[in-house]
Design a protein with these regions (language model features):
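Positively charged n-region of N-terminal signal peptides that target proteins for export
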Residues: 1-4
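Bacterial N-terminal signal peptides
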Residues: 6-14
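Residues in flexible loops and secondary-structure boundaries
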Residues: 9, 148-150, 182, 242-244, ...
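Generic alpha-helix signal with a bias toward terminal, lower-confidence helices
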Residues: 13, 152, 246-248, 271, ...
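Sec/Tat signal peptide C-region and signal peptidase I cleavage site
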Residues: 15-20
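N-terminal "domain-start" segment
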Residues: 22-225, 252, 298
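Acidic, glycine-rich flexible loop segments
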Residues: 199-277
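Short solvent-exposed strand/turn elements
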Residues: 278-298
Length: 298
């Protein structure tokens, strides 16, 4: 009897420990999460615009400073091996990917790997992503993974966000449309193509606030952040404004925009795969590229 009592106590403790060690199921962000992301993106856009206005005349461009360029480099194929797009996606869209200005890329859903300063993350789970942005952000303007602050699109868990420094991004979910035949006149894209970029600081701030909650036009919702949905096609306009972005590393001041391509692009992309770990693979096509405007300071 005494042995049975001890055994029962031991078994109870063991089961409690096992339950405590279980990893809780991963929660998927919902509409409130998306709203929070959009709000943070809008506030960040306004704050960073203010920084550009204050400091735009203090730093000259210099892309020859030793030690700085690696932060803005394109990662090698070996470095991005852990994010190689699924073969079935590449095969399925092989004909589409033979067209000009198209591509396929897998975004890392682990936002801990995406530091905003361009440095690599020290997180153990990010050991396979030791390059700027950690695979969480992509620039269609330079066709490469990028540090988040210079990207056109980033993935935060399952939320797509466009809110880089000195950039105004607009996302729209076009539903389960085929990407192959979309053009600048397509529903949902037509608004992006005809949208007039902000010319002043006040217009920029107003637009950021509107995109925080969303702009409804012709049956489509345009926002800074949208939930990534499998098989959905999205439109994106990314306006990377001209100007200066003063930065300093180890006491050396430089203009970050000297290491970037400041263009105004319109892209369509389709979510071709969402992996079990949340990584999102997209196929994309650039529809238009032009020179970016410059915000007029007061």
């Amino acid at each position: 009897m005494r042995f049975s009592l001890f055994f029962f106590i031991y078994l109870s403790i063991a089961l409690t420990n096992i339950a405590a060690q279980r990893v809780p199921p991963r929660t998927r962000p919902t509409a409130p999460d998306m709203n929070a992301r959009a709000k943070a993106a809008a506030e960040r856009n306004v704050r960073e615009l203010r920084e550009m206005e204050i400091e735009r005349k203090t730093v000259a461009k210099d892309n020859t400073i030793v030690g700085i360029p690696p932060i803005y480099r394109k990662p090698t194929k070996e470095e991005t091996g852990a994010l190689e797009p699924p073969k079935e996606v590449v095969d399925k869209y092989s004909e589409f990917l033979r067209k000009q200005r198209t591509g396929v890329v897998t975004l890392n859903a682990d936002e801990r790997c995406g530091t905003d300063d361009g440095l690599v993350s020290a997180e153990q789970s990010c050991a396979s992503f030791q390059f700027p942005g950690g695979g969480t952000a992509y620039s269609f303007r330079v066709e490469s993974y990028r540090a988040q602050r210079l990207s056109d699109l980033k993935l935060a868990k399952n939320i797509l966000v466009t809110d880089s420094f000195g950039q105004q991004g607009i996302l729209v979910d076009l539903g389960e449309q085929p990407i192959e035949d979309l053009d600048l006149k397509s529903p949902g894209i037509h608004f992006l193509a005809n949208f007039k970029p902000a010319e002043s600081s006040e217009e920029f701030r107003t637009l950021s606030r509107e995109l925080e909650t969303g702009m409804n036009k012709d049956g489509f919702l345009y926002r800074l952040a949208l939930i990534a949905k499998a098989n959905h096609t999205f439109g994106l306009r990314s306006i990377a404004y001209e100007g200066q972005s003063p930065r300093s590393i180890n006491g050396v001041a430089y203009d970050e925009f000297g290491f970037d391509r400041r263009d105004d692009v319109i892209v369509v992309f389709k979510i071709a795969d969402i992996a079990q770990n949340g990584n999102v693979t997209i196929v994309w096509r650039e529809l238009r590229r032009g020179d970016s405007p410059k915000i007029k300071s007061k």
